[in-house]
Structure formats: C-alpha cells, structure tokens
C-alpha cells in the first residue's frame, strides 16, 4: 500500500466515521498536507460554496505587514473558535440541510442533528449558505473533540441531551453580493437569529487565535483566492506557554511506506482542555538536538492549541 493510499484510508475514517486510529493531535501533526494529495470523500454532500481554510501565522510582524499592505482599509478581528465547522443551507427562509466541512468541498449531512441548534426558519427569501462553528464550552474536557464527536453520533436521541452544551456560532453568509462589509454581515446574521463570532462570549469557548479580515467585502473579494484560502483574511495564532512533564519512553512507529517516526510517551498532563500523553519527535536528529533522555523533564506546547510538541528539555533545579 502506498503512503498516499494509507493517508486516504485514514482520512476516510477521520472525516467520515469519526473513528480514526489517530488522535486529533497526531492527525494534524502527520497529515496536515492531506489536501495536497487530493482526498475526496467516497460519498457526501457538496457545499453550495466551498468552506475554505485560512492562511495562518504565529508572527506578529507578518500580521503587521499584512495589515499595512492594505493601507486605508479597515481590518476587523474576531476570535477563531475551535470546534467543528458546518455549513447551513436555507432556501426561501426554510432550513434545508446542514453539512460538515469535510474536505471543504464535500462534507457529511448532519441535518438531523443541526436542526436542533439553528433556526428552522429565517426571514430571508433567497437561497443562502451560512457557515459557522459548532462549539462546546471550555468547562467540558476536550471541548473541540466533544463538539466534533457529537456531530458524528448516529442517533438523534444520543445527540439531543448534548444540545444544551453545544452552540452554533456563525461567521459567514453567502453569496456576499448584496452585503457591503463583514461588520454588516455579522449584524445581519444576528438579526436572523444566529449567534456570531462578534456576539458570543469567546471566553466561554475554546479558541485558537484570531481571524483578521478586510472589512470591505468588495475589496476583500478583489484580493482573490488560492486553492486553500482567501487572501483578504489572515489567522493569527498565539504561541502559548508550555507545560512541564517528563519523558517516559519513546516509541518508534513504522508507517505503511516504511518511514519510521519517533513518538514521545509523556507523563499525562493537561494543556488547555486536553489531556496530552504523546507528542511527535519528528526524527532522531530532533531528539539529539533537544538532548532528550528517558526520564528527563520536558516543556510541551500544543502548536496552534492542537499539535503536541516538545520544545525543550527542562533541567531540574
């Protein structure tokens, strides 16, 4: 089996079944380039408008340069909520369908769950797609996984008890043609009965940075798009302080392609809302560069609040 075939197999389980053999962190660390190999779900629902990703940076200077490159344009920011992205389709004011992000073009129909979280009717006569994030409060351990896992539940009766904990927070409505700015768009979404990234108390939900957008939608659209993201938006992620634990062991995992990758086995530690016990080590050179030994203390972060990574050895005092 080729490496790409193996990635597609894992992708199918991750996107469609919610039964991936990898944790979210391992998935993101090892398969961040999935879109590059062209994965498409075997079946599903096509979004009326693609749900694109965002270009991301951890560098304040890069963010400042990006804002400066659009001199004269107002840039608005909003929290980047960390949940499960979903598009909602309405036609003539009636709820039609809800679809998970999937690969950005095709997702899975979750209408039987989302109908409990969004308005059944809205005061708008045309067909529109409303994009947003299903989130769970930070008081729930692994809130991001809880939100995504809830949408993967097969039966309505299993989902309904979770409705009081879950919330759909809208951040986009398309087509944009009749809306002049993101500020107006978000206000209009609120008037239709939706919580938005501007109205919700983001301190109650997990976030992984900020989203910056050029407010004028006509100008934003003229910046164009890559195959991955719009050029008129930029996500800024804050590198948070790490947590100290100890290196218990190193496991060597051999992939189907024969590539051997070291994985750190850690003393379990909470980082944000997630219990972390494993982290990628990339290769032997990385282990030697950090001077790691079994039993030593290490500082661990979750890059972008997702990927567990050892950043340094911590010497005992």
For each of these PLM feature ranges, what is it?
Residues 1-317:
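RNA/tRNA-interacting regions in translation and RNA-turnover enzymes
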């Amino acid at each position: 089996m080729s490496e790409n075939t193996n990635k597609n197999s894992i992708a199918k389980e991750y996107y469609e079944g919610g039964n991936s053999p990898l944790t979210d962190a391992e998935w993101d660390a090892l398969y961040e380039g999935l879109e590059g190999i062209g994965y498409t779900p075997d079946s599903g629902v096509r979004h009326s408008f693609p749900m694109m990703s965002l270009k991301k940076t951890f560098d304040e200077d890069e963010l400042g340069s990006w804002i400066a490159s659009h001199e004269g344009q107002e840039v608005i920011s909003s929290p980047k909520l960390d949940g499960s992205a979903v598009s909602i389709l309405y036609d003539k004011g009636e709820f039609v369908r809800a679809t998970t992000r999937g690969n950005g073009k095709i997702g899975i129909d979750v209408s039987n769950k989302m109908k409990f979280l969004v308005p059944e009717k809205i005061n708008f006569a045309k067909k529109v797609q409303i994009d947003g994030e299903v989130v769970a409060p930070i008081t729930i351990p692994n809130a991001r996984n809880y939100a995504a896992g809830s949408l993967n539940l097969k039966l309505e009766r299993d989902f309904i008890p979770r409705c009081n904990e879950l919330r759909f927070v809208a951040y986009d409505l398309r087509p944009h043609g009749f809306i002049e700015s993101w500020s107006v768009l978000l206000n209009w979404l609120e008037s239709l009965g939706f919580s938005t990234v501007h109205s919700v108390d983001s301190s109650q939900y997990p976030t992984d940075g900020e989203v910056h957008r050029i407010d004028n939608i006509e100008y934003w659209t003229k910046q164009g798009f890559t195959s991955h993201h719009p050029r008129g938006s930029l996500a800024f992620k804050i590198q948070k302080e790490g947590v100290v634990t100890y290196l218990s062991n190193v496991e060597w995992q051999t992939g189907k392609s024969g590539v051997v990758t070291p994985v750190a086995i850690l003393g379990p530690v909470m980082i944000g809302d997630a219990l972390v016990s494993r982290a990628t080590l990339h290769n032997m050179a990385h282990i030697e560069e950090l001077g790691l030994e079994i039993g030593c203390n290490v500082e661990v972060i979750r890059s972008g609040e997702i990927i567990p990574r050892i950043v340094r050895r911590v010497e005992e005092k």
